[in-house]
Curated annotation (Swiss-Prot):
UniProt similarity note: Belongs to the MTD family.
InterPro entries in alphabetical order: MTD, MTD_sf
The protein's role, per its UniProt record: Catalyzes the reversible reduction of methenyl-H(4)MPT(+) to methylene-H(4)MPT.
Pathway: One-carbon metabolism; methanogenesis from CO(2); 5,10-methylene-5,6,7,8-tetrahydromethanopterin from 5,10-methenyl-5,6,7,8-tetrahydromethanopterin (coenzyme F420 route): step 1/1
Protein name (database record): F420-dependent methylenetetrahydromethanopterin dehydrogenase
Enzyme Commission number(s): 1.5.98.1
Catalytic reaction annotation: 5,10-methylenetetrahydromethanopterin + oxidized coenzyme F420-(gamma-L-Glu)(n) + 2 H(+) = 5,10-methenyl-5,6,7,8-tetrahydromethanopterin + reduced coenzyme F420-(gamma-L-Glu)(n)
Organism: Methanocaldococcus jannaschii (strain ATCC 43067 / DSM 2661 / JAL-1 / JCM 10045 / NBRC 100440) (Methanococcus jannaschii)
Classification via Pfam families: MTD
Keywords, sorted A to Z: Methanogenesis, One-carbon metabolism, Oxidoreductase
Gene label: mtd
């Protein structure tokens, strides 16, 4: 059986570029077919409504993942309304502001995954250009991957795939990814590696707070420019901590790897030269 997965990307968070790729890292899975629709950087209600309706009415997947910033904003709110009435199981993946509508999403019959270490970018014109945007997202992706947050998202979606394959009702995830949940998912062997990953996660959480201050709470350019610049320096160092954590695990030949089998089963290994089982 091939499970058809629909992914809607409106706007961008750090998880957005990799959420589909994490399900099929070598492009050799035979049990899934992924279809992605998006509205680029925009997440206004009209753009979101267009792609969400197209996913529901034309693609008609077995389940839908909607991913983007701030699930409480007007655009994502429109998507939630459409998805809750579609009859198709759906999950909202978002950043920390989504905590404000966690209960509302549950009442709408939607699943959710809130990623607390996926921070807002420093979106001030004097500071943010395409290069800075790309560097920031590259650092965030490293933090998501190295702390375990990415693995939690991937495994939650894999469980939904398993349910469809087994003919069972999909149990929609209701997950808030905290630092403790993330590092547990990474199965660190070296306690110092775990500590570095925890530090990276916590710094990434604070990056969002600093960027909110710089983007929405500070009006003077001479004040908000260094504020958002400081947030980007923070995420750069969080990414360095993740690299250091992984190097410690490499030194012990204990990096946790969980590749997919072509039939979809999750395999596991730690020693570099052993086969995953």
């Amino acid at each position: 059986m091939v499970v058809k997965i629909g992914i809607i990307k409106c706007g961008n968070i750090g998880m957005s570029p990799v959420v589909d790729l994490a399900l099929d890292e070598r492009a050799d899975r035979k049990d899934i077919a992924v279809r992605v629709l998006g509205s680029g950087a925009k997440m206004d209600p009209e753009s979101v409504e267009e792609v969400t309706k197209k996913m529901v009415e034309e693609v008609k997947p077995d389940f839908i993942i909607y991913i983007g910033p701030n699930p409480a904003a007007p655009g994502p709110k429109k998507a939630r309304e459409i998805l809750s009435q579609s009859g198709i199981p759906a999950v909202i993946i978002g950043d920390a502001p989504g905590l404000r509508v966690k209960d509302e999403m549950e009442q709408q019959g939607l699943g959710y995954i809130i990623i607390k270490c996926d921070p807002m970018i420093g979106a001030r014109r004097e500071f943010l250009d395409p290069v800075e945007m790309a560097l920031f997202n590259a650092d965030v992706i490293r933090v998501l991957a190295g702390t375990g947050a990415l693995r939690i998202v991937q495994e939650a979606i894999d469980k939904m795939i398993d349910a469809v394959k087994e003919g069972k009702e999909i149990e929609l995830p209701k997950i808030v990814i905290t630092e403790q949940k993330a590092v547990e998912a990474m199965e660190f062997t070296n306690p110092y590696a775990k500590a570095k990953a925890m530090a990276a996660f916590t710094i990434a959480e604070k990056v969002g707070d600093v960027d909110v201050k710089g983007c929405f709470m500070t009006k003077e350019a001479e004040k908000y420019i260094p504020i958002v610049a400081s947030a980007h320096e923070m995420i750069r160092y969080a990414a360095k901590l993740v690299d250091e954590a992984r190097e410690l695990e490499k030194a012990m030949d204990a990096v946790s790897r969980k590749p997919h089998h072509p039939e979809g089963k999750r395999l596991s290994k730690k020693a570099l030269m052993e086969k995953p089982e």
